[in-house]
Design a protein with these regions (language model features):
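Conserved small/polar residues in nucleotide/adenosyl-binding loops
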Residues: 167-169
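Phosphate-binding loop and its immediate beta->loop->alpha context
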Residues: 27-157, 162-163
Length: 169
């Protein structure tokens, strides 16, 4: 890629509290607005029982705080490397694998970024901590493998990682 060509890949920082998506374009802001012209999306999903749908980010928090009946799920990143990732949770009366829950949220990041960019992204660079799980190399590798699996399932054909401590935006 030369400096006059937009990058083919997007970068996703899937955070415990908030997430961001970046796309390198000449002369443009790197971070993409994901919700209400804001570059962050709270890493939250609310399953609204009344309307039988998931909502994400600030809208999820709003509906929860307004008293809609449902289930709020936060800190989704903490599933990575945990034993829970191999299990299901009850969502809107059905069993949902935790991996699918991650896919819903990361898929939402992808679709919002694509809508804002006016193009599809088939390549992604995912930010990752130095260790998803301290002192457990197998769990750390499983966390990374899970992210690759989820990213491919939602449509990314190429997946790579960048340690977050090295990212400078």
């Amino acid at each position: 890629m030369n400096n006059a060509t937009p990058a083919r890949a997007c970068g996703i920082d899937f955070g415990t509290s908030n997430s961001t998506v970046g796309w390198l374009r000449p002369g443009e802001e790197t971070l993409i607005a994901l919700e209400d012209d804001k570059i962050t999306l709270p890493s939250v999903v609310f399953f609204n029982i009344e309307e039988r749908r998931p909502v994400y980010g600030r809208l999820a928090l709003h509906e929860y705080l307004e008293g809609y009946e449902g289930r709020l799920m936060r800190s989704l990143k903490s599933l990575l490397g945990s034993k829970l990732i191999k299990h299901d949770t009850s969502v809107l009366g059905t069993a949902m694998p935790f991996k699918d829950l991650l896919g819903l949220f990361i898929g939402q990041l992808k679709s919002r970024a694509e809508a804002a960019a006016g193009r599809e992204f088939e390549e992604v660079v995912l930010g990752r901590p130095v260790f998803f799980v301290d002192d457990d190399a197998a769990a750390d590798q499983e966390a990374e493998d899970t992210l690759v699996e989820v990213a491919r399932k939602i449509g990314f054909k190429e997946v790579s990682f960048q340690y977050l401590s090295l990212i400078h935006i």
